[in-house]
Amino acid sequence: MILLVDNYDSFTYNLVHLLEELGAEVVVRRNDDVSADEAEEMAPSHLVVSPGPGRPEQSGATLDVIRRLAPTTPTLGVCLGHQAIVEAFGGEIGPAARLLHGKTSLVHHDGEGIFAGLPQDFSAGRYHSLSAARVPACLAVSATSDDGEVMGVRHRELPVDGVQFHPESVLTLPVGRDLLENFLER
């Protein structure tokens, strides 16, 4: 079972439906309706942290859930979820170089982990005004955009990935589906 922490975003159920199409059972809990203790007791096979408005520190229990589950549970953060991963591990979030809502960018990646087998420089949908300003040493930058923004991070030791773009967006499909499939195989 996948625990999906919903950060009150309209894209949450796009993620749910895509994960279910890939055969996953998904349980959705809002960020103010789940604690780190409850998330741990659920013993999910995977954790997905959804997009959402605002900053990671304003997203209910999101940071606590990431910190609690990340050592043992494959974790994927999308947009705000990606930013929350960066912040949970000691990085900093700041204003993006430019606001991008419903725009596409080319994503260059390292071809490893969730990016294995994906085409290089694929087009991805972006919907964000914040981005990773400082990535902590425990995270590797796994993808960047054509304008130099961090588009992906991967923990150097734990099964944790974040993507700033939206794999569930029609602007990223079908590559986004393949990325989620790679995540589920972790």
Regions found by a protein language model. Give the residues of each.
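Generic structural signal for residues in well-ordered beta-strands
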Residues: V26-V28, I93, V141
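Catalytic beta-strand/loop cores that center a nucleophilic Ser/Cys/Thr
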Residues: G113-E157
